[in-house]
């Protein structure tokens, strides 16, 4: 059941999509109340509107397959409440050194052979040092040479570091907002919200595409989920890739006992993301294994068109590749073939 914070509001105050769109066009931005109104639509109506937005912008209806590799695991000095890689938490994740170039390239070759379009490299750093950037740029060049799109998530970036990654050929840089600004401090204290926005600005200024999303189910209210999506949608331009994670509670972290978000509320979140960011790749990220096949199918109906693909994400499990391909085939969904980066204009 949905909690009191996620119960649908009376429909008397809900405006039509056309009215909402006019207000957005006039102001240039989505408001939290407008996005709350979308959340509160009858489920079938919300799904229909999301499908309309999806089909208008992705008529081919394909699903992008992205593989995520942890190139440097554990030992992070930050205190993100959801993350088992934080050194201060007693989890099963052990600190490891940065992977070598050949090991990364072997993983990228395996990902391409399995059908992935994009290869994402993640490192558990607060921010990379310049010597780290030199090593990662070699990885980027090697992965690009295989014909894969590249993405990296390395923590906060200075402008010169972002430029170095772009010059190496990096297509996307991931830096999530995680949640709404007012809920953020209850989850993280070691990195400010503005720090995240500054990194996104540095990525844009360097000429790379942005991958930016967050995590739902951390105890936030529906209003806070709406505020989170409003902030994403009002970035100019909004992110080309929007990963939406469903919290995976991990033993030893502060959110280990967090009550799961209602699955239908997660589907609503995907639908609202599609409507408010119609040209973005909306990616089902962590937590898919826990959601199961039926909810994932509903997420694809709601406009999700990208998944993290492969048995392991950074530190949490993921459906096996064969299971994903079988589900997509059963739903009649084809996978994205082109490796050309999509850029919003």
Curated annotation (Swiss-Prot):
Binds 1 [4Fe-4S] cluster. The cluster is coordinated with 3 cysteines and an exchangeable S-adenosyl-L-methionine. Binds 1 [2Fe-2S] cluster. The cluster is coordinated with 3 cysteines and 1 arginine. This is Biotin synthase. It is an enzyme of class 2 (transferase). Pfam families: BATS (PF06968), Radical_SAM (PF04055). Residues 61-288 form the Radical SAM core domain. The gene is bioB. InterPro entries: Aldolase_TIM (IPR013785), BATS_dom (IPR010722), Biotin_synth/BioAB (IPR002684), Biotin_synthase (IPR024177), Elp3/MiaA/NifB-like_rSAM (IPR006638), rSAM (IPR007197). Its cofactor is [4Fe-4S] cluster; [2Fe-2S] cluster. SMART domains: BATS, Elp3. GO terms for molecular function: 2 iron, 2 sulfur cluster binding; 4 iron, 4 sulfur cluster binding; biotin synthase activity; iron ion binding. SUPFAM superfamilies: Radical SAM enzymes. PROSITE patterns: RADICAL_SAM (PS51918). It catalyses: (4R,5S)-dethiobiotin + (sulfur carrier)-SH + 2 reduced [2Fe-2S]-[ferredoxin] + 2 S-adenosyl-L-methionine = (sulfur carrier)-H + biotin + 2 5'-deoxyadenosine + 2 L-methionine + 2 oxidized [2Fe-2S]-[ferredoxin]. Belongs to the radical SAM superfamily. Biotin synthase family.
């Amino acid at each position: 059941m949905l909690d009191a914070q996620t119960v649908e509001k009376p429909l008397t105050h809900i405006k039509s999509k056309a009215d909402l769109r006019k207000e957005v066009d006039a102001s240039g931005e989505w408001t939290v109340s407008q996005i709350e109104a979308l959340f509160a639509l009858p489920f079938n109506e919300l799904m229909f509107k999301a499908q309309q937005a999806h089909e208008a912008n992705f008529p081919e209806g394909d699903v992008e397959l992205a593989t995520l590799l942890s190139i440097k695991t554990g030992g992070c000095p930050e205190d993100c409440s959801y993350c088992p890689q934080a050194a201060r938490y007693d989890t099963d994740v052990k600190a490891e050194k940065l992977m070598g170039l050949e090991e990364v390239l072997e993983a990228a070759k395996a990902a391409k052979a399995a059908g992935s379009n994009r290869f994402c490299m993640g490192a558990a750093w607060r921010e990379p040092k310049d010597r780290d950037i030199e090593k990662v740029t070699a990885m980027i060049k090697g992965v690009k040479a295989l014909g894969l799109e590249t993405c990296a998530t390395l923590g906060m970036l200075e402008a010169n570091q972002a430029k170095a990654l772009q010059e190496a050929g990096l297509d996307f840089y991931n830096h999530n907002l995680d949640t709404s600004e007012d809920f953020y401090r209850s989850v993280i204290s070691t990195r400010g919200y503005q720090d995240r926005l500054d990194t996104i600005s540095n990525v844009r200024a360097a000429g790379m595409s942005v991958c930016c999303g967050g995590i739902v189910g951390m105890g936030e209210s529906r209003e806070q989920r709406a505020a989170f999506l409003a902030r994403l949608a009002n970035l100019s331009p909004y992110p080309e890739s929007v990963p939406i994670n469903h919290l995976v509670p991990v033993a030893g972290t502060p959110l280990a006992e967090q009550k799961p978000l209602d699955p239908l509320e997660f589907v609503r979140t995907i639908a609202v993301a599609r409507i408010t960011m119609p040209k973005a790749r909306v990616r089902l990220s962590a937590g898919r294994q826990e959601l199961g096949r039926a909810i994932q199918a509903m997420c694809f109906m709601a406009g999700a068109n990208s998944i993290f693909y492969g048995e392991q994400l950074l530190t949490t499990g993921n459906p096996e590749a064969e299971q994903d391909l079988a589900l997509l085939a059963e739903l009649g969904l084809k996978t994205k073939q082109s490796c050309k980066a999509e850029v919003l204009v």
